[in-house]
A protein has these predicted regions:
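Conserved NTP-donor binding/palm subdomain of two-metal-ion nucleotidyltransferases/polymerases, i.e.
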Residues: 1-119, 125-418
Length: 418
């Protein structure tokens, strides 16, 4: 378990759903507050922190948070308007879809959607509808930008305009992006998890939020999808902390919801519930949420190695810039059944052969258009970016192997004592 910087510890303490100590924020100096706000901006927790702890912040921080909230409220109105335009086009053309994440997380995951930083609108469309949906968005003025080939969605789409980045995460003028998902889980890439989530689509339902009617996942399936998103991000070394906080909030609010948890057991099979339980355990670790007895039972049934991994390694993901690690590999391998696939994933992570893409290869230019370098320039930049990361991979290799050995030994002792 890694020692956290003071500003990160203060954030977690303030956001704990049981036994939180928001008053600790009152003892922070300005330099620590600057570090804290940079951290909560990047983890999408700033507005959740403002709702729970703004009274303990100094005046300049309260002013900053008030502006962030005002900007994000205006941004949410823009998101609603953009969705309304898309939904009308989809409905008129008979394009089937469900809304994922975003405003579909109200009310159990996010008590106020104006506290949730939403940068894009996510849809899931079945194969027969997804390209029609894309073409309709192009007709509305959206343009595709390059996306990781392993993404679960088509290339991200964004409407061109005169917006420029000004360093404000909550800028109401940021044009909403759109992701058209063609799958809810990428077993081919991850080598574990559900082989099919078609039942999620068949159980979809219409919901209403602030005057918006939209198709969404069934409540139980939305929990499953949210938990799987956390697990996916975790093994992909890219955990987004606000997703864990929202999951913790759902668990805490539904401790006594016996009907919901009975449905959860009836609709999701044992392996699917156990994969979700890993994300639930992480939510307890980070945000001290209460859980229903059914959830507690599934957490207790997690293998000893996974429990030890969460205890020893999970906190490093709270401070990824300082704790560069590939420890997620050991959790990932523990979830894969096939020895052959374990080796494939291990080699992919420890000795990456494919050069990564420079994250700055796509930009919105001064006139608002989406641009990308020419092919040869992209090739050179990709090679330079990937090569520049080779020393990092070499440095992390022995550390990762040592951490894996330590985890294996700790889990072995745990099993012997059980």
């Amino acid at each position: 378990m890694s020692k956290l910087p003071r500003h990160i510890g203060a954030v977690l303490s303030a956001l704990r759903l049981n036994g939180g100590r928001a008053e600790e924020l009152g003892s922070l100096d300005d330099a620590t507050w600057h570090a804290l706000l940079a951290y909560t901006d990047s983890t999408h927790l700033t507005l959740y922190l403002a709702a729970r702890a703004r009274d303990f912040a100094p005046g300049w921080v309260r002013q900053r948070l008030a502006k962030n909230l005002s900007d994000n409220s205006r941004r949410f109105e823009r998101i609603k308007a953009a969705y309304g335009e898309m939904a009308y086009a989809f409905r008129k053309a008979g394009v089937n879809h469900v809304v994922l994440k975003g405003f579909s997380q109200w009310p159990d995951y996010s008590e106020d959607l104006r506290l949730r930083l939403q940068s894009d609108i996510d849809f899931y469309c079945p194969p027969e509808s997804i390209f029609q949906a894309r073409d309709l968005l192009i007709g509305l003025g959206y343009k595709e930008v390059p996306t990781n080939s392993f993404a679960d969605h088509l290339p991200i789409m964004i409407r061109e305009g005169g917006w420029q980045w000004k360093g404000n995460y909550y800028d109401p003028d940021i044009p909403p992006m759109v992701e058209l998902h063609h799958r809810l889980w990428n077993r081919e890439r991850l080598r574990f998890g559900p082989s099919s989530l078609e039942s999620f689509w068949s159980r979809r339902q219409v919901r209403r939020v602030e005057g918006i009617d939209f198709p969404a996942l069934h409540w139980v399936d939305n929990l499953g999808f949210s938990a799987l998103q956390v697990l996916r991000d975790l093994v992909n070394h890219g955990l987004l902390l606000h997703k864990v906080y929202e999951l913790a909030r759902f668990l805490d609010r539904n401790v006594d919801n016996k009907h919901f948890w009975q449905q959860w057991i009836e609709l999701h099979d044992g392996p699917l519930r156990q994969w979700q339980a890993i994300a639930f355990r992480l939510a307890v670790q980070y945000f001290a949420c209460d859980v229903a007895p059914q959830v507690a039972d599934h957490i207790k049934q997690l293998p000893g190695f996974i429990e030890k991994w969460i205890v020893h390694s999970a906190d490093s993901f709270l401070n990824p810039l300082e704790n560069l690690t590939k420890d997620a590999l050991w959790l990932h391998l523990a979830l894969i059944d096939s020895a052959r696939e374990k080796i494939a994933v291990g080699l992919r992570v420890l000795i990456p052969m494919k050069l990564q893409t420079d994250p700055e290869m796509v930009a919105i230019t001064d006139d608002g258009t989406v641009s990308q370098p020419a092919f040869f320039q992209r090739l050179l930049r990709r090679a330079a970016y990937g090569t520049s990361r080779l020393p990092l991979h070499a440095r992390l290799l022995p550390v990762t192997l040592w951490h894996g050995l330590r985890l294996w030994w700790s889990a072995r002792e745990f099993k012997a004592q059980a």
